[in-house]
């Protein structure tokens, strides 16, 4: 089955699933007589009726994000397996792969640098270096293609940026930066592994030169899986990359909903202009804040073909802390006076949909107990949101585990069942992250352990 047939089948299944889900939710059928009050105000009282309707409308804050995910999943083929180079690698622009680390896991960094360098050579890449930016020296072996940059403890940015933003800004200082304005930087996390497809996609993006910033898909199920629960939960993020991320970059060339902090490709001149020096509010989710400022400055973004590989958090505690930091960082970004509402409106809707998740989750219990009169368009939109989010777990598993079930439908069925079983866990963790994130300290940067040898 070729990629075009797979994509057509996926689109047909997605549409059928949305319609069937709406049908089984009773959207297209009349309720049993007497089961729904004709006047909610008379039955529940004015205040409780208003609360019930507000809860229903709150559930639609995520609708713009869902529509973008639908557009991305249906308009663009996610099943092409090979990225073709458009020009000879020898003629490609100079690329710096930059890894930022605290220096707590030196062996992990060294091993991944070696692995990624081999992948670069396998892809035929010539004009590149790896740059490791660390708070503590990790003493990398001498190599003309590897540069270790230790951030001095006394270094301070003009605005007081901290954590990863501080380290990234240090690299851009005149007396530290060795790159030319037209060179490119690929930002990686400690555990990020390149693939030949990702390298080909990056080279095509850089060679094209139409956009200053780009990003691609990251999957989490390659290699040995440490925690199946967190890995299956992260399958949603894979579908989110192939849906919303791809849609916003391919159609609008803007980070309408922000972007991730890894597999980030930037042109040096543009990155130095935007900078990471945005104070504490730009230090928790420095990637998201950076994207909003870049959009404000008028820079354009594009989607990069080819995937990279990372690991999901190894423990549930790390998983919770990771989500908490994202929520707090996006909250600081959305509430920053440095970014105009026109640039952060969709990101704000996405944030508030997440922040009100504990309330919207209650509807699972409240809807049967306090039914409201039917409104076909409204009810269909609610079922659409639920159907699409469920499908994204399934689609994410299909893409993430394709190398593991290639010759076994039974394995695929097991992975899909596992993903569906993790949904309650994911909802619980996301709700906990909201509660901890909204009421906890917002000046901390939790480091997730991705070194498998320490587990």
Swiss-Prot record:
Top-rank taxon: Eukaryota
GO cellular component terms, semicolon-separated: cytoplasm; membrane
Tissues in which the UniProt entry reports expression: Endothelial cells.
Biological process, per Gene Ontology: carbohydrate biosynthetic process; glycosphingolipid biosynthetic process; protein glycosylation; response to toxic substance
Record EC number: 2.4.1.-
Main location: cytoplasm
Keyword list, A-Z: Cytoplasm, Glycosyltransferase, Insecticide resistance, Transferase
Involved pathway(s): Protein modification; protein glycosylation
Disruption phenotype: Worms exhibit resistance to the Cry5B toxin produced by Bacillus thuringiensis. This is thought to be due to mutants having reduced population of glycolipids which are targeted by the Cry5B protein. Mutants also have reduced brood sizes at only 17% of wild-type N2.
Zinc-finger keyword on record: no
Localisation: Cytoplasm
SUPFAM superfamilies cross-referenced by the UniProt entry: Nucleotide-diphospho-sugar transferases (SSF53448)
GO molecular function, a single term: beta-1,4-mannosyltransferase activity
InterPro entries to which the protein is assigned, alphabetical: B_mannosylTrfase_Bre-3/Egh (IPR027389), Glyco_trans_2-like (IPR001173), Nucleotide-diphossugar_trans (IPR029044)
Family matches, as Gene3D superfamilies: Spore Coat Polysaccharide Biosynthesis Protein SpsA, Chain A
Role, per record: Glycosyltransferase with a proposed role in glycosphingolipid biosynthesis. Involved in susceptibility to pore-forming crystal toxins in conjunction with bre-1, bre-2, bre-4 and bre-5. Involved in resistance to the nematotoxic C.cinerea galectin Cgl2. Has a role in determining brood size.
Identification of the protein by name: Beta-1,4-mannosyltransferase bre-3
The organism of origin for this protein: Caenorhabditis elegans
Gene: bre-3
